[in-house]
């Protein structure tokens, strides 16, 4: 069930990226992947090293053309379907991991989210949990091999690591520079408002009294910081942990748009539950195992496969050890006062980190108490300004917040991060795509208009484009009854000054053409 669920997550993640890849990192996208590869390649060539080791991906070979990007997404979807139906599961998972690693490492800021890294870590671990026979059928699970058993322990550790550090960072990363919203119990009073893409249910949750928000932290910390230790207390401890983790993720699903992350976390809970504990009908319909040992790969001696997997799992253990020591030491309120990671381990982790075999996690380490939003506007005359309305982004105050997960509209997410910066900054990681977006809107680019729900300039591009920073708040129930609006907003100030189109060449007085 775990592998089948992972195949579904891969399919969702790749499909979600595919429908926007050209607009974001295609040849004419906001941040072309080809430029990223060119930049990294030149920098590393100057150091006498291939850029592959900084950004391992297939597009060093094929080039990051639109055709190559779309072909990778198409192949990834096909391989995910093979995993779901139980055919060539091992090779398909290996191909999926390579393809998604390539997409992440060429996606720039649009692919820099913790769940993308979590999917890669999960996908890498799945290579040691799956069977590599070519043919499969529905049946009861066979006995686990030694490699499977070790990998299963790693799977238990992964979900425990994810959940524990999600709770621990909320407490350990509070400092004078980062107010103690979590430790003082006020974080949930503004979480529903300030999350990147709110939902209409978040509006309702935001209206609840402060005591409720503070009380809701108790079960959250119980699930995130206590239940991870239940993983070591036998199958019933793992069963309790699985239901606790899954229950928390379902509650988050009901109030937020956190892409496929919640579903991936639920899938990660499946190895905690023994297959025999599932109803027989469900087990027979959702599990797959190999048929006999007829495929060529199945004839490989178990000893050989264990010999190949052993060093990889040892390396995985070392990287996880490095991450644990680093995270427990580097927090403002560290658990470890000294860095206990030896230099050779730091070097090893640095070499393999671009492949994301293991990572540290910690969602909502810091919180924002207000909701700034960037409002892009265009004008034909410099006096009358009309606002652009972007798909899934908070713009119109009258529009009800919607559910979009498990799809991730990544431009809408990046707008949220850019707004937190307060003002356009050329040194920011968001500067490149934002500048490109403004110029494309100014020039009336047809492709970029696919990001829009409403284009105020359908016939001719504006002469000027600007960006203002707004502060959005949820309306109160009384305000919504009176106005019908879900939001209210005020102007904070300028985010980006007016950007104009170059003046068209004018003819010389003597009619001799442009001067």
Predicted regions and their residues:
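Alpha-helical membrane-anchoring segments
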Residues: 1-515
